Amino acid sequence: MRRLLPLLPLALLSACVTAGGQRSAATGAAPSILTMQRLVERLSSDEFEGRAPGTVGEQKTLKLLADEFARLGLKPGNNGSWFQDVPLVEITAKNATPLSFTGGRQPVSAVYGTEMVVGTYRTDGRATAVKDSPVVFVGYGINAPEKGWNDYAGVDVKGKTVVILVNDPDYETRELTGPFNGRAMTYYGRWTYKFEEAARQGAAAAIIVHDTVPAAYGWNVVQSSWTGAQQVADSANANADQSSVIGWISNDKARALMASAGQDLTALSAAAKRPGFKPVDLGVRASVGFDNQVRKHMSKNVVALLPGMTAPDEYVLYTAHWDHLGRCQKAPDGDDICNGAVDNATGTAALVALAEANVKAGPTARSQVFLAVTAEESGLLGAQYYAANPVFPLARTVGGVNMDALSVAGPARNVVVIGKGKSDLDAYLDRALATENRLATTEPTPEKGFYYRSDHFAFARKGVPMLYFEGGDDLVTGGRAAGAAAAKDYEENRYHGPKDEYDASWNWAGVQSDLNLYYRVGRELATTTAWPNWVAGDEFRAIRDRSRAKTR
């Protein structure tokens, strides 16, 4: 999700792609870079309007994928259908008032879009408002009994507004040890968790303080992601158990709020990192209101099956999310389509290219499932729905690979494994890497929490070993400095914005090598009898062991 674009001369690019293809062909067939290019260009064109769920862009995406899988001769995966229904609710906040804080030294007001964003998970369609709600600073908003940590200790926040820091208390440490894994983010650091816990505590409103470093993206990403239509999972109670208001506030406005309350955000943040932190009643009251335009709709996951020959009831899973943001915050040139070329037309196209290569290589012992999921950008909703309602039993799912935002920065000496050391799939990847003369490395920025930000996480939580890697930050041309520069350029100028667009001059050599790796890992999983597992002591090991025990 975070890289772009140093270019190679076309002749060198062609040579690199050809070499990668020849290496992969040793196992049967090379995933086609031409298929990748064709589909990425098409999926990220303005015709698809940014591929937001519940739009014309979704319908065009679904048709394209079903047509591609049918062309290849795959089978519809869901009882004769290419699709799995995913019930969603589209909620668009309208006529938002400023988020105002009163009762302090001076009133503070934050304007929607530029200084704050708000919305709701509640799907009843009623206008949303909190008025004169007492405000409590709850640090990182974490309640983790197993770690002896409770940021809500000693305070009742029912009906109140909680202000929460993003990430978790250890993120600034250099080590990978500590109550929250040191610099490596835990799920307690994700914004999704913050809102989940605030709802469990009964908060009327939950507001996260944006900070670029611990959030891992700038305010521009919050703007483009949180303004406009939002997708929410439907439920029987219309999500009445969720906080009435959720949202973000800019760092500058958060500092102004704290100053008005006689507090200092820097000092409070430092205190929140220490064990025994106690929530702080700020002595101010919050008010905000907005109307909700609600539309229930049935989005869809795409499920394609390549049946196995001798173990057809054992499944290898390939995943990628087809969705992006649709219409979004306008760029200065007036462009308001977030095309999502890298994120994630590349992963979606890779799904088809891998299916194509496996068809050409011939059948495997195990079945292979190619799953394009919806609403990843809204919190992994499509993947979570499949994981809760699997078309193919997760206990019979051997493992899989997830593809999200393939790197077009050029060939790299390494791949960055998100969650390296968690499962036996690392060994499968190492064998594939040897054929590409590349190495697996750990995340350079584990504090950004990439492990919890893509669809593999939904399956890992159910015990299925999933491999997710990025294309590498040690570029053949320019090394790590060039890799870091490409990542910075993408994050700041393209990620979740209108400029994530297809470029005919992209360097596809690294993509070809990455495709070869996905292919080899998936092919080995599909042709052996082994059942990879999580390493001993991993958070998902016991879940996997229990599910496997039921099948024996």
Q: Predicted regions span which residues?
A:
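Catalytic-core environment of secreted peptidases
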Residues: A30-F48, P53-P76, S100-T102, Q106, ...
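Extracytoplasmic/secreted proteins, especially bacterial periplasmic and envelope-associated proteins
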Residues: P31, T35-R38, R42, V56-E68, ...
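Metal-dependent peptidase/peptidase-like ectodomains
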Residues: G113-E115, A127-T128, A153, G159, ...
